[in-house]
Amino acid sequence: RALVKAPKLLLLDEPLGALDKKLREATQFEIMNIQDKLGITFTVVTHDQEEAMTLSTRIGVMHQGQIVQIGTPQEIYEYPNTKQVADFIGSVNLFEGQLVEDEPDHVLIESAEAGGRIYVDHGISSAPGAKVWAALRPEKIQLTKGERAEPHNCIKGTVKGIAYMGNLSIYLIALDSGKEVKVTMPNQMRAAEQEIGWDDRVSLTWHANSPVVLLS
């Protein structure tokens, strides 16, 4: 009914809050199609981050009353510019460390929290010795049973929790440093056939382009 007058701006306040998950997901695509056809700006108020990521073309993240980053959902999620943004959108593992090398094609971070060295395949134009954080999303970590020996991007820990979600499982890993890390893996095998179980020793590895290096 609100679209009959062809407004320039339409405010939607928790429009999908009363719907179940499947209907909510279907309605998200319907709202996107309507907005695309009409070309009207929609401002959506929601407490559901997945809903915000799905419906938005631009997201603004505020911290202490100031906008700290504006970008597409992909930019906000994959390339946060601060720890606050990385932690606010989705789930993230943050490893504090010291910059050992900073070259145009890579950086090397020594992290006591990770219990090893973190190699990233791009430079950040900062001085060696600087305090930095490596942000690593749970789904970008590969989990294997047993202990592997790699020069970097390989840390060890013990499985302390497993949450079976149907299409995926969330693993809570206690690193040897004492830090807890979250890992998300798709369930490609049936639950009874899963290789990794509670209290197993595991290795966590990731690609060099997976972490984002943050200075603040």
Feature locations, PLM:
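A generic structural signal for ordered secondary structure
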Residues: 12, 35, 53, 60, ...
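Non-catalytic connector elements of ABC transporters
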Residues: 92, 102-216
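Short beta-strand-centered aromatic/proline hotspots
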Residues: 97
